[in-house]
UniProtKB/Swiss-Prot annotation:
The name this protein goes by in its record: NADH-quinone oxidoreductase subunit I
GO biological-process terms attached to the record: aerobic respiration
Gene: nuoI
Composition bias type Basic and acidic residues, residue spans: 153-176
Assigned protein family: Belongs to the complex I 23 kDa subunit family.
Length: 183
């Protein structure tokens, strides 16, 4: 009946939105902030004394659905210690040509050595530069940290490192409860 008015209604919607504020961001000049839980580039973390948290267990590589992570473990010695445990990640690479930034590797890491930053600008001109090595992924040394290799500074055994930040009384109570449950 009044079908000839349909194009006019469509133009009404167009004119109505023409005068609204544009939500477009001028990206290279103005960067929108990311959400706190955004999955961006990976980072290999360190203990407060500078030793690496990665123990070279390769669980992150096994959990990766895109097969983007390559880990090769090395043995720690008392002369050259890179992490508190027996082993460390001697070779660590993430291929960002394959990585889908899903975060499954972070969930698989038993020592919380691997986290994801908010950095999302990973584009580059060459394929070789998108394969990040351990040196590129390691968190920078903060004040008070010493570059590895060096002896353990935060305790005598690796258990001392893994108990950092935990309530020692709670750990002792848990040990007592476990021993009582076994008996």
């Amino acid at each position: 009946m009044l079908e000839w008015l349909n194009p006019v209604k469509g133009f009404g919607v167009t004119f109505h939105t023409m005068f609204k504020k544009v939500p477009t961001v001028e990206y290279p000049e103005v960067k929108a902030p990311t959400m706190p839980r955004f999955h961006g580039r990976h980072q290999l973390n360190r203990w407060p004394d500078g030793l690496e948290k990665c123990i070279g267990c390769e669980l992150c590589a096994w959990a990766c659905p895109a097969d983007a992570i390559y880990v090769e473990a090395g043995d720690n010695t008392e002369e050259e210690r890179y992490s508190p445990g027996e082993r460390y990640g001697r070779v660590y690479q993430i291929n960002y040509l394959r990585c889908i930034l899903c975060g499954l590797c972070v969930e698989a890491c038993p020592t919380r050595a691997l986290t994801m930053t908010n950095e999302y600008e990973l584009a580059d001109d060459s394929r070789e530069s998108l394969i990040y090595t351990k040196e590129q992924l390691l968190a920078p040394l903060q004040q008070g940290m010493e570059a590895p290799p060096h002896p353990m500074r935060l305790g005598e055994t690796e258990k001392d490192y893994y108990r950092l930040g935990r309530d020692d009384n709670a750990a002792a109570r848990a040990d007592e409860q476990n021993s009582e449950a076994v008996q």
